[in-house]
Amino acid sequence: MSEPLFLNSVMQEKIWGGTKLRDEFGYDIPSEKIGEYWAISAHPNGVSKVANGRFEGTDLATLYAEHRELFGNRPEPVFPLLTKILDANDWLSVQVHPDDAYGLEHEGELGKTECWYIIAADEGSEIIYGHNAKSKEELRQQIEDKNWDALLTKVPVKAGDFFYVPSGTMHAIGAGILILETQQSSDTTYRVYDFDRKDDNGNLRELHLEKSIDVLNIGEPANSRPVTVKADDLSSTLLVSNDFFAVYKWEITGKVDFEKTADYSLLSVLAGQGKLTVDGKDYSIQKGSHFILPSDVEAWTLEGSDLELIVSHP
């Protein structure tokens, strides 16, 4: 019998983290500085484990390696995606991620293209999304001169906004923002600027200026243009589609039947509660639930009065 894969996952403590993962989602957090919940992950720095069914207790990396049929026997050698929720209680560093070629050559892992769905944002919250330098030479000079106000592009944000952040994009998440991030399964980050913060030992965190300059794009970031289709009890918005992933927002106000259109899908519930039905079996879902519908799930039903989900697939 086919079944969904619900997951138990890993909290990551961060210098900029807070308590919203507990306050908003009810997660049990181990400290007051939790910045990330790696909700669906097979990355070695934080691997999810299956919480139900015949694979209960198996980590996602092992499951992907040993049961590729559950993932459509796709060619990716490792599980390609990672879903996170980030609680930015303070600014994250200004940073950039490499593309696959640079990441594999210099770090031994994939690069990182990602995207952000803004779950919640305090009034006046901002992100850094791109920069104003017109050439690599100007970029280097502005960084060396620490001319951050002139260099960095700040954008105000609110709940429901979406940003596509391809590799090579200068970016930072600002204080007071809660984000669901869909990304390539990579943990490579090059810090450009960290607001001169010190860690618990009084040391400045490492910067990676030469690698950052190597990989930073020149020109404005290419954000996506979401497209919404409505039918009966479902509003489906395609947020972005590219070589790495497609990401949708589903808003469900009743009972909706689905048929498989991808080899497998990753689903995260951002609001509401309801039930998922697969092969005649009901599963309760609520805000904060994360699960995978593997390749052998050919059809399913979602039912709820005010469900909001982010759905992705490679």
State where each predicted segment sits.
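Short acidic-glycine-tyrosine-enriched beta hairpin
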Residues: 152-164, 178, 279-297
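Transition-metal
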Residues: 1-134, 194-222, 247, 308
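Ligand-binding loop in jelly-roll beta-barrel domains
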Residues: 78, 86-91, 100, 110-111, ...
